[in-house]
């Protein structure tokens, strides 16, 4: 994957079959995404925001660093959101909030910050 990030010409020069790699990456992405959504539900914020934050934290796009940081960020976000949904944390009630409520509260400012940083960088 890292060779593909450096461009098609570089990937071809080091012996990567671009068409095959892209096909397998698309298939793998679809299968993994479908599996995760089937088990956890559509928590889109975590899946979209954590990889972007991981790249910003790592300062690189090398997958050997970004993937573990993304997994840790996703786990931390979900644990924090789960703690916030417990009774008496955000609201003083015996009811439990849906998980997407605190994710939206946490996610909106983070998404705005990411958007502003990306816009500032001109990407």
From Swiss-Prot:
Q: Which domain of life is it from?
A: Archaea
Main localization, broad class: membrane
Q: By its UniProt entry, which InterPro entries does this protein fall under?
A: ABC_BtuC-like, ABC_transptr_permease_BtuC
Q: Which UniProt keywords apply?
A: Cell membrane, Membrane, Transmembrane, Transmembrane helix, Transport
Give this protein's Gene Ontology molecular function annotations: transmembrane transporter activity
The protein's topology relative to the membrane is:
Multi-pass membrane protein
Q: Where in the cell is it found?
A: Cell membrane
Q: Which residues form a coiled coil?
A: none
Chain ranges passing through the membrane = 26-46, 64-84, 96-116
Q: Name one GO cellular component term.
A: plasma membrane
Family recorded in the similarity comment:
Belongs to the binding-protein-dependent transport system permease family. FecCD subfamily.
Any idea what job this protein has?
Probably part of a binding-protein-dependent transport system. Probably responsible for the translocation of the substrate across the membrane.
Q: Could you identify this protein by its name?
A: Putative ABC transporter permease protein MJ0877
């Amino acid at each position: 994957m890292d060779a593909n990030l450096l461009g098609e010409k570089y990937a071809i020069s080091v012996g990567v079959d671009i068409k095959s790699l892209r096909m397998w990456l698309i298939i793998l992405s679809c299968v993994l995404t479908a599996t995760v959504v089937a088990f956890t539900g559509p928590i889109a914020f975590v899946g979209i925001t954590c990889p972007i934050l991981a790249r910003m934290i790592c300062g690189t796009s090398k997958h050997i660093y970004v993937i573990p940081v993304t997994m840790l960020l996703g786990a931390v976000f979900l644990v924090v959101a789960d703690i916030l949904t417990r009774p008496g944390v955000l609201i003083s009630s015996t009811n439990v909030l849906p998980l997407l409520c605190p994710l939206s509260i946490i996610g909106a400012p983070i998404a705005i910050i990411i958007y502003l940083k990306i816009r500032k960088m001109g990407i």
